[in-house]
Amino acid sequence: MVTIEALPLRPIEGEQQALHVGAHSSASDPRRTMVTNTSESPLASRQATLTTSTRQKHTSYRLNTAFFLFGLLNNSLYVVILTAALELLPQGVPTGLVSFANIFPALIAKAIWPYFLRGQVRYSKRVWSCAALSFIGMLLVSFFPALAMRLVGISLASFSSGLGELTFLQLSTRYAPKSSETRSGLTAAQAAGAGLETSFAGDAVGWFASGTGAAGLIGAAAWWVVRPLGVQTGMAILSVLPAFMIMAYAIILPSVQELLEGKDGKGGAMYAPLSTEDDAVERSSSDDQPTTANDDRQDSTIHIGPGSEQDVKVRLSFQEKMALLKPMLQPYIIPLVIVYAMEYTINQGIAPTLIYPLPTRSSHPLLSHIIRKLTDYYPLYQLVYQTFVFLSRSSISIFKLPAIPRHLLWLPAVLQTGLLAVLLTESLYAWFRESIASPLVIVLICVEGLAGGSAYVSVFYSIGVDEQGRGIALPSTGEEVDDEGQEEDSAYTMAKKAQEHEFRIGCVGFGDSLGILAASLISMPLQVSLCDAQVRSGRDLCKQT
């Protein structure tokens, strides 16, 4: 005898579900009802499990690839502009002007946008808008040699980069946790406290951070490849990069529902996501029930029940956003500001003054092949820094290392402050032993890159898998909700927690930009002061670069 058991899933935004128990349930959509056949052969069961596992891995790879490309493409133009700063400005104009135009608009986007947004994020429009702004900005830089127009173009690209980072971090919160899997074998509660819990949201953040780290290397390399063609042609070629970001969003990125369909029966029954309005409109081909643009384009509107015509609209008030912001300051935002303020002060204000006599083959065989003139020191420092930023930002995604636990997120800030103090005093007093001074500085810059990258990925990973964000995928009770009022309350709570999670990860994003902006204002006078102090003490190598 065949026993058929139907387990209902929670209704998902943008879909109309009809679940029936009995003979009719065996013909229902398998994406919305789990059917267990007790007479199924072991071989068929193993084959089904293998197929499901393969499908889930493929979908998970798509998610990881998409978010890696988002981080890479969104941040590459920022790096390209910084690398090409000297070629973009007339002679005699300080490169700090490019740095300011390249960071201040991004800070504005990250700091203000989450508070002006009302209701649910429209991700498709955001991605298209970011790509368009970047494209226009790069064309202005390419075809208008006037300083004012180039600064406008740089500012547009910067604003796009800041808004893009905010958008993709918020998008990551729309992906549900993975059952109870952990990297360490701990219970879910223990893993959450230690920052070890795995989730699709955590994977998305990890791979996005890895992409932003890779942008430092690939963006600089891209400019050096097109540089011989000149600013106009080179920048015009690189202006097509945002188009690949749209392709990654439209083609590679899976919907939330696709991830859950790829899981085994247990995983699919435990979690039901709140999808974005884009899932319903742009990926409607994968749904059995047709959706209309008007239904799904309503900002912050969710459907609350099978066959229900009622909608719930959710909008966070400014007071609610302020209440969500306050608990994020001490554990996340302030440490991130300090890390990046110290890090970029080292890179822009102190590192250019850490110049030493050229290494000889007898004393430093390897360095003597890399550093052939005094101007080679600073590019080497930047290459080492970017490499170790990439490695540390990839610690979760590629190297499968745990994130820094929430209660230890201040450690990178303390470490960066200590590194700044050490390198500042070395620049002033040259207290490192001469034979090891330059290799030791390189090692310390490696540590600086590791600390900064690990702080970035750990902060956003911690928020992505935070218990407070679980409203995005709530456990199913396995029972039909008969009372319409209770069902509406549940749907409203789900949608509100989803928006709260989006805001929480979005409001932290301005921390790194604020630190970088502060560092850019400090670094210009600091570099001049340090070099003058070295000259007064009889060391004039900084004047020769």
Swiss-Prot record:
It is a multi-pass membrane protein. GO terms for cellular component: vacuolar membrane; vacuole. Residues 23-49, 276-304 are annotated as: Disordered. The chain crosses the membrane at residues 66-86, 97-117, 127-147, 205-225, 234-254, 322-342, 408-428, 440-460. It is found in: Vacuole membrane. Keywords: Amino-acid transport, Membrane, Transmembrane, Transmembrane helix, Transport, Vacuole. Its main location: membrane. The keyword 4Fe-4S does not apply. GO terms for biological process: amino acid transport; regulation of intracellular pH. It comes from the Eukaryota. Belongs to the battenin family. Involved in vacuolar transport and vacuole pH homeostasis. Also required for cytokinesis. This is Protein BTN1. It comes from Mycosarcoma maydis (Corn smut fungus). The gene is BTN1.
